[in-house]
Amino acid sequence: MKDFPRILLLVALMLVSWSFLSAAEPAKVRAKPNILFAVADDWSFGHAGAYGCKWIKTPAMDRMARDGILFTQAYTPNAKCSPSRACIITGRNPWQLKAAGNHWSIFPPEFKSYQEALAEHGYFVGMTGKGWGPGIAKNAAGQKREMTGKSFEERNFPSKITKGISRTDYAGNFNDFLDAAPKGKPWSFWYGGHEPHRGYEYGSGVAKGDKKISDIDRVPACWPDTEEVRNDMLDYAFEVENFDLHLGRMLAELEKRGELHNTIVVVTSDNGMPFPHCKGYAYNNSDHLPLAIMWPQGISKPGRVVDDYVSFIDFAPTFLDVAGMKQSTTGMASITGRSLTEIFKSDQSGRIITERDHVLLAKERNDVGRPKDEGYPIRAIVKEGMLYLHNFETSRGPAGVPETGYKDTDDSPTKTAVLATEKKPDLKHLFEASFGKLPADQLFDLRRDPDCMTNLATTVSFADLQKQLFEELKQQGDPRMLGQGNIYDEYPYGFADKRNFYERTIGGEKIEATKEE
């Protein structure tokens, strides 16, 4: 019996070891990171403090840039809500998504979203605000799909800050989601702000945002520099700040709960600002977007600025990668994008991965208003600071037709100001840039001409860019390259009130179109 104390000690040590092992097992499972994807609605590149902008205050994004990575060359493949978001959730380019390459589409059931895949592999998924859309998304059985997760929308403010800013308490809804998340289970949340989508309350940037007309250091070269345009820009800025405010509250809540360390947070926008020559076009201010990613546990050497070209099709494979999921097991259609984890693991700034030297862009049918529900097909490539565009249907206008009000560009004080330049000889080039007919080929030097106002295609060779663009599109099965591009005009709009809008309007019908959410 004199060995009894020794035996007791051995048993105690074994019990302690077992307890550590059993405790470590759920820790391994929980080691999968949480994912917070924050996407604004119509926010252009450069409009954040982290990029040096003085007339928009974005402390939350600025913090993410300091504590993570700030990207300078992030692009959506399509500068319109539905197709851009389709690229985000599938990891595929718009020409690989059938009807989902159009705006206001009927989303094909065959394309699974990364949120749906994560949910099937142990993640708790949810969203607030605007998910994929506008459009209709149902499964093969006709049931509505939760493309970006279960909706959390219970919390709203009693009144609006402005007529244009949503009452939705996005951060409050995020708190409800966190409360509902099972302990020990990783989660993925989609924060889809409705801001800075139009319409704005004119003058709210000055009246309620404590801004001054003189705060704006530069009006883009594609618009006239007027008080109305500057006010419009400040109203837009005030809405961007509202989006950032909720993001800041979400970061603070994660910190409070001790979950920020192992949460990958992404902040970006679906497309550029809702102004002429921006949203819905294929120029620099259309597809070039803000992007910062923070992940304390997973990003080496935070505070870096990365100049590699990044496409929105890279988000889905990144999220699957950090979740430890093989794409072949997800049930998703093959992914074209490339995970960003190589950049996360690097300690370099500037250009890191040699192959990330370009992105591909596109446009098909966006908003209503053209005869026969026609779109405006474009394919483009951005490489090493040069943007080359090929416009397939030069007889059509890029923003629609005057008879229905150029509906491919959102109504706004700036749109009104640009339309007015048609009658002003010294400013008519502004009208032509946004609403006039375009040549088949356009080439811009984004380093010298970020607003894409000087077409170099008549004096500088674009043959190499065109060749690379067309070859990659063919490899990816783009119908435009296979003589089947008309299919995009044949896909019906998701909502009946969108169909044959031009013919019905010309025929005298007064149509109250579905409001875009």
Name these PLM-found stretches.
Residues 2-5, 10, 16, 20-442, ...:
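Formylglycine-dependent sulfatase
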Residues 471, 479-491:
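Mature extracytoplasmic/periplasmic domains
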